[in-house]
Design a protein with these regions (language model features):
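OB-fold nucleic-acid-binding modules
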Residues: 257-305, 310, 339, 372, ...
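Short nucleic-acid-contacting surface segments enriched for D/E, G, S/T with interspersed K/R
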Residues: 295, 334-351
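Short cysteine-rich clusters marking metal-coordination/redox-active sites
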Residues: 387-390, 405-408
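Long, hydrophobic alpha/beta structural blocks
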Residues: 98-108, 112-289
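OB-fold (S1/OB) nucleic-acid-binding surfaces
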Residues: 305-333
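Long, charge-rich boundary regions
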Residues: 344, 417-482
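Flexible glycine-rich surface loops and low-complexity tracts that mediate binding to linear polymers
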Residues: 298-303, 345-361
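OB-fold/S1-family single-stranded nucleic acid-binding modules
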Residues: 356-384
């Protein structure tokens, strides 16, 4: 592995640059873009793949990090499919022509005719401004306006280009502000050629099952074993063929290449991401702070007995430390209803949630993402005592008069308390794989978080396998060590 050094200034910005790439005349350029796709098609990561293809051909450009795929607040109703923005961090001698190229490429290749509202921001500098980093953190769990983004863009002298209503600049700014210096994962995404977009994707299911079994837990959410579903392929008309998510770039690459597809692909690229980190649920809230479309978690006490709705959905209510109450919805596809319906008043829980806004026929509701049962309340039933002689149940003699066995004539004043055994236990409960959002943290990742760099000497990008142009996945090259 090559030797790398990390300057103190770069360490603060969580940007690691190899020592041989830190020439005096290289500037660090951060390129962020979002909202280039629509429900009808295209994909922001695909544009990142194509832009990277261009940048890799330029001798004066060096990547200082993997391309970043940053998933933002998944509860935003006007988001495109995955609410993912992209950031490319490069070292270069000349920024102006790169910015012009990316700006023009995004304006030409975004799905504007179908409602895309792309935004592109470019910032030069080693250290990302604090205001941009805070904006990025907020974008993970709250609603931010275009005006919020524009104020920071102006104050920090960030170059910004937008089309349509320009909402993409919100995600673009958030992307360059997310440094992923803490937990993160990787995803190797393969892309279809233009002529194949919209046609059925063909994958060998047995190879996917084998790959998943061999690589778990270094890869995750490849399949939903309970419902027998493949999870690595999207279902829409976008150019993504499949994506393998995991803990390190080598494993996701080897896993992708093992699938041996017959379809000729445009290529593939590895992203460093915040997927699978629960990054949107790390802010603790009280109900007085809750607003529509926010995400977070709250600790509270069950204050209303759960009840099951038609279709298997479950509703219950919890109160927080201020004794404010909120209804909680547990939808059938999550498979959490079987746990939620067994809660009783007085149980202490943590819940991760997204906020559904109030509408004509329902109030504001917390949509459950995870349930942590911290303390189960005891359920005690009072029964008439047993006769110590014949072991039959005694009869009440009347209010305040105690109990008597009708056969043995033995009397007692004491009632008999029975603690009911609960069918659930204290612990952490997560929805089924098929209901996971991009940001949902799988159970096996708790306690296995990554840091960056997580090995001596960062994995550079590009490397022998992290970017590949046109061919079959089985036209693979040997995965060499970095």
């Amino acid at each position: 592995m090559g030797k790398y050094r990390i300057s103190s200034t770069l360490r603060k910005a969580a940007i690691q640059v190899p020592a041989d790439k830190m020439a005096e005349d290289l500037n660090i350029l951060h390129l962020g873009f979002d909202n280039t796709d629509s429900i009808q098609g295209k994909c922001t990561t695909h544009l990142a793949f194509k832009i990277t293809n261009y940048l890799l051909k330029k001798n004066e450009i060096k990547f200082v990090d993997f391309p970043l795929l940053i998933r933002l607040n998944p509860n935003i109703p006007w988001k495109t499919r995955g609410n993912g923005a992209v950031c490319l961090r490069i070292a270069t001698r000349g920024s102006e022509h790169i910015i012009d190229y990316v700006k023009n490429f995004i304006s030409v290749n975004s799905d504007i005719s179908n409602g895309a509202n792309p935004g592109f921001v470019a910032y030069e500098g080693v250290t990302i401004p604090t205001s941009v980093r805070q904006f990025s953190r907020t974008a993970l769990y709250n609603v931010l306006s275009l005006n919020d983004a524009e104020k920071i863009i102006e104050n920090e002298s960030i170059q910004c280009y937008k089309c349509g209503n320009g909402h993409g600049s919100i995600g673009a700014l958030a992307a360059i502000g997310c440094l992923l210096e803490g937990d993160h994962t990787f995803e190797a995404i393969s892309y279809r050629t233009e002529e194949n977009v919209g046609t059925p994707r063909s994958l060998n299911e047995q190879l996917v099952l084998k790959m998943s079994a061999v690589t778990f837990p270094r890869t995750y959410n490849n399949i939903d074993a309970v419902h027998k579903r493949i999870l690595i392929t999207p279902h829409g008309p976008d150019p993504v063929f499949c994506g393998i998510r995991g803990e390190d770039p080598i494993t996701v690459l080897k896993s992708l290449l093992s699938l041996q597809t017959t379809e000729i692909l445009e290529g593939y690229m590895v992203f460093r991401t915040n997927q699978g980190t629960n990054m949107h649920l790390q802010n603790q809230l009280v109900f007085s702070q809750v607003k529509p479309f926010m995400a977070g978690y709250v600790r509270g006490t069950v204050s209303k007995t759960p009840y099951v709705l038609q279709g298997g959905h479950v509703l219950f209510e919890i109160s927080d430390i201020a004794r404010d109450t909120y209804p909680v919805a547990v939808y059938e596809p999550t498979d959490l209803g079987r746990i939620a319906k067994q809660l009783v008043i007085g149980d202490v829980v943590d819940i991760g949630f997204g906020v559904r806004e109030e509408q004509k026929y329902h109030s504001r509701i917390l949509n459950l993402e995870y349930l942590a049962v911290l303390r189960l309340n005891s359920i005690v039933h009072t029964q008439n005592p047993l006769c110590k002689v014949c072991r039959k149940r005694m009869k009440s003699e009347g209010k305040g008069k105690g109990y008597q066995c009708k056969e043995c004539k033995i009397k007692t004043i004491e009632k008999y308390n029975v603690t009911v055994k609960r069918d659930i236990v204290e612990g952490f409960y997560l929805s089924s794989n098929k209901s996971h959002r991009h940001l949902t943290k799988p159970l096996h990742r708790f306690g296995q978080e990554n840091s960056y760099p997580y090995v001596p000497g960062i994995y550079p990008f590009p490397n022998p396998n992290s970017f590949h142009r046109k061919g079959h996945l089985n036209d693979r090259i040997e995965c060499r060590s970095f």
